[in-house]
Amino acid sequence: MSGKPTLLAIFSLFLGVLLNGQQTATQQASTATDTKQPSTLSVTVKVVNVPATVRDKHGQIISNLAKDDFVLEEDGRPQAVRYFAHDTDLPLTLGLLVDTSMSQRRVLEEERHASYSFLDQMLRQSKDVAFVIHFDHEVELLQDLTSSREKLESALQTLQIPQFNSAGGNSGSQGGNGGGPNNNGYPGGRGGGRHGRGFGGGGTLLYDAAYLASDELMKKQQGRKALIILSDGVDRGSKLSLDSAIESAQKADTIVYAILFKDDEQHDRGGFGGRGGFGGGMGRHGGGHRYPEEERPDGKKILERISKQTGGRLFEVSKKYPIDKIYGSIAEELRNQYNLGYTPDPADAEGSFHKIALKTKNKDLTVQARDGYYAGR
């Protein structure tokens, strides 16, 4: 009889220990859960990226500088370089903007072959993408962002100067209303624009093309970004201004390189007004804008301004400096860029423009970089 109470006491003691252990384990699990899920504060920090190319006094690219070799200012105030890289491992997005107005009819074949060779040389299949846009009286995306060399080559093959029929209408150069092989671009008169942003009209819509390429395509991309414009630089009929085109590239952190092909005969002065002549346009007879000779814009100065303010360069095609050699120079720059970043004042008003000045401590070196950025974008 005396063994039963003892056994009961032992059982009660065991049960108490077990329950206490479960409670302790539960408390520990709760504590562990609390430890794994701390409250967090998310802070978005704006970083201004400044890609740069450095040359010596002979024009040779310098590629062995360190972060401390640079001096960076915003609106005259020194800035600390928070991020610095000098490698080409970042993804690259390239955009080709090809002028297909009548002024470029003599050079289009040369542009086509050199452009494909450049893309074939630059694109890495796993990282890089490119797109092709043509512009004349409309802006059309012939090939959207892709890493496929075959698709890009196909788009370049569709580039043509417009043909005009005997009745004075634009017969279309790329399949009538069908456009190019990827007619999902910004056509002004061939089936609607991408995201509704296409601008149609008469002339050569250079500014519209540059704006749309930056705002619709480049702005969404990460890494290194460069637009290459092949044109004589004279805009006819754009709805947007030169300032708007430059601003869109700056907001998209996109460098613009310009390849200038001069129109020796100035064919468009005779009344074609670009590809939109003899039809289409915005209610103007003959399509496009016809500049009197004394009012004709300086296309070289226009392209120089676009490229300089975005950190790029203007190249002028000549017998001594053909387009394939120019593409080689652009490729060399893209392979030897420095990427600097700094954090601006968060109190800057949204949309306000701020001047950037980047130089090296060595006064014999010249830095090529963007000249500013827009806050809060």
Positions of PLM-derived features:
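Scaffold/interface architecture of coatomer-like assemblies
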Residues: 21-377
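Bacterial N-terminal signal peptides
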Residues: 8-20
